[in-house]
Design a protein with these regions (language model features):
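N-terminal helix-turn-helix DNA-binding core of bacterial DNA-binding proteins
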Residues: 23-70, 81, 91, 97
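N-terminal leader segment of winged-helix/HTH proteins
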Residues: 1-37
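Alpha-helical linker/hinge and terminal dimerization helices associated
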Residues: 43, 81, 110-122
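Residues within the DNA-recognition helix of helix-turn-helix
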Residues: 74
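Basic, amphipathic "hinge/linker" alpha-helix immediately C-terminal to the N-terminal HTH DNA-binding motif
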Residues: 90-113
Length: 122
């Protein structure tokens, strides 16, 4: 068997080929969203986008301490989950903005409820 044919698969103990798992393979959608939100900066990116669309540099200035690499990764994940959209204007210089999708606005309203719950006295 060619080595190249194994790309994207995993060999298990019995040497069977196992199909690659999809990027979002969680059986529980709550677990999937909790995992996404569990990454540092993700909730803050959502919060800042809840006030309106932002360019990459604007977001980075709103989040002191976040690196360009991490911010790009968080935005890519949020776009991949359909929570954020990326728009590019046909202008020079290129103007890219990020904004919440309808799904993202729904998620922010849930995060607002979680914040209200967290602020209640114990």
């Amino acid at each position: 068997m060619e080595t190249g044919s194994l790309q994207g698969t995993r060999i298990t103990r019995g040497f069977e080929r196992e199909r690659p798992t999809p990027r979002h393979a969680s059986a529980c959608p709550v677990e999937e969203i909790a995992a996404m939100l569990g990454h540092r900066w993700t909730a803050l990116v959502l919060w800042h986008l809840s006030t309106g669309s932002k360019r990459f540099g604007e977001l980075q200035r709103c989040l002191p301490g976040v690196t360009r690499k991490v911010l790009a990764e968080r935005l890519a994940t949020l776009i991949d989950h359909g929570v954020v959209t990326r728009s590019q204007a046909a202008s020079f210089p290129r103007q890219v903005t990020y904004q919440l999708s309808g799904r993202g606005r729904g998620l922010v309203s849930i995060l607002d409820q979680i914040e209200d719950w967290a602020r209640q006295p114990h």
